[in-house]
Amino acid sequence: MKPAKEIRVGNIIMVDSKPMIVLRSDVNGSSRTGFTYKWKMKNLLTNTPMENVFRGDDKFDVVVLDKKPVTYSYFADPLYVFMDEEYNQYEIEEENLGDALHYLKDGMECEAVFYDGKAISVELPITIARQVVYSEPAVKGNTSGNVLKEAKIENAVEAHRHTVQVPLFVSQDDVIEIDTRTNEYKRVVRN
């Protein structure tokens, strides 16, 4: 058990018998009156957000989640199916995947996150390479400063086709590297 004052953003704790990830932490108070911690959290099982205020000496169980390398296999409406190297299949609900939906591609390797023996989400590699499937051509004379345009990238599910801001020189069919944490263009990948 850890006191609230030792819990950091990104820690997974049990609140009312539910696993919650701490997304943001604001501290108020003084050493004389005692500190309070206002946390913005997300339930790992239902993806519902929650905000709550705790005293610095409130204690919480810290949860360590299991992770296992898996490969994205297919979409079986409304579940996404992943397979490990032993051909075990894990089904994850669409709402639990979050932004990972934008980058999933058949055969993509990632890590499944398990809580209590059940796959609850996936973690993607930090950077991935994706082909640009549509991008407006650059307009001549539109080159002053850091000018960006939208580019649609390939992924497994057409309904979740995603756009990324890219420089003007990026064109359709280019392969670009993207940071999955920030959804930012990194560079053009040369083959």
Curated annotation (Swiss-Prot):
Listed A to Z, the keywords are:
Cytoplasm, Elongation factor, Protein biosynthesis
**Record's HAMAP family?**
EF_P
Give compartment(s).
Cytoplasm
One Pfam family this sequence matches: EFP
Superkingdom to which the source organism belongs: Bacteria
What protein name does the entry list? Elongation factor P
SMART domains cross-referenced by the UniProt entry: EFP, Elong-fact-P_C
The protein's job, in short, is:
Involved in peptide bond synthesis. Stimulates efficient translation and peptide-bond synthesis on native or reconstituted 70S ribosomes in vitro. Probably functions indirectly by altering the affinity of the ribosome for aminoacyl-tRNA, thus increasing their reactivity as acceptors for peptidyl transferase.
Q: Which organism is it from?
A: Janthinobacterium sp. (strain Marseille)
Q: Does the keyword Protein biosynthesis apply?
A: yes
Task: State which pathway it belongs to.
Answer: Protein biosynthesis; polypeptide chain elongation
- What Gene Ontology molecular function terms does this protein carry? translation elongation factor activity
The Gene Ontology CC terms held by the record are: cytoplasm
GO BP: peptide biosynthetic process
Which InterPro entries does this chain map to? Elong-fact-P_C, NA-bd_OB-fold, Rib_uL2_dom2, Transl_elong_fac_P/YeiP, Transl_elong_KOW-like, Transl_elong_P/YeiP_cen, Transl_elongation_fac_P, Translation_prot_SH3-like_sf
The family annotation for this protein states:
Belongs to the elongation factor P family.
